[in-house]
Amino acid sequence: MTEQLKQKLNDSAVLRWSVLALVAFTMLCGYFLTDVMSPLKPMLEKELLWDSLDYGFFTSAYGWFNVFLLMLIFGGIILDKMGVRFTGMGACLLMVFGCGLKYYAITTTFPEGAMLFGFKMQVTLAALGYAIFGVGVEIAGITVSKIIVKWFKGKEMALAMGLEMATARIGTTLAMVLTVPVAAFTAAMRIKMF
């Protein structure tokens, strides 16, 4: 009966394209958060006293767990064993947790000279958050591909995958275009309020 119900859900064009919009928006947010720090490098150097080594350490963190701990392979195994709902929710939770840790690290003032693994504590915690976020967003990408394959068949599948990726990359564009003006605006608002 569930197979028959699933078949009927897949037949609904409105539902099919709504699912695509939902997963594409999720990936748009993921790509936005992946690239949001790039335009802020000068601000990080000026306000948080990061240098190029700190920034390079931070940005390299995105691939740490995916490459060295083979998390993408484990993510694929989990996706095959547990399904798209479990894996998708888990990936989103990893993204939120990693992003929260990165935000905490960047907005918290740590004691001067506090070091962790030879780097400033702030940089290390931000990098750890970014590494966790990276696992979540990459596993979400695998999950989105499987969702598209489940919902779309034939000639629509390639179009759906292309639309999802194009929508996700809009997140990168938004990060490059909006980040500095928003940061400058919020900094100006903080100055006016205090």
Predicted features along the sequence, with ranges:
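Central cavity-lining transmembrane alpha-helices of secondary-active solute carriers
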Residues: 60-77
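Small-residue-rich transmembrane alpha-helices and their cytosolic helix-loop interfaces
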Residues: 27, 59, 63, 92, ...
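Helix-loop-helix hairpin linking two adjacent transmembrane segments in secondary transporters
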Residues: 164-194
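Extracytoplasmic
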Residues: 18-52
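Cytoplasmic helix-loop-helix junction between adjacent transmembrane helices
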Residues: 123, 129-166
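C-terminal ends and interior cores of transmembrane alpha-helices
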Residues: 93-118
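Small-residue-rich segments within alpha-helical transmembrane domains of MFS-like 12-TM solute carriers
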Residues: 31, 35, 118, 122, ...
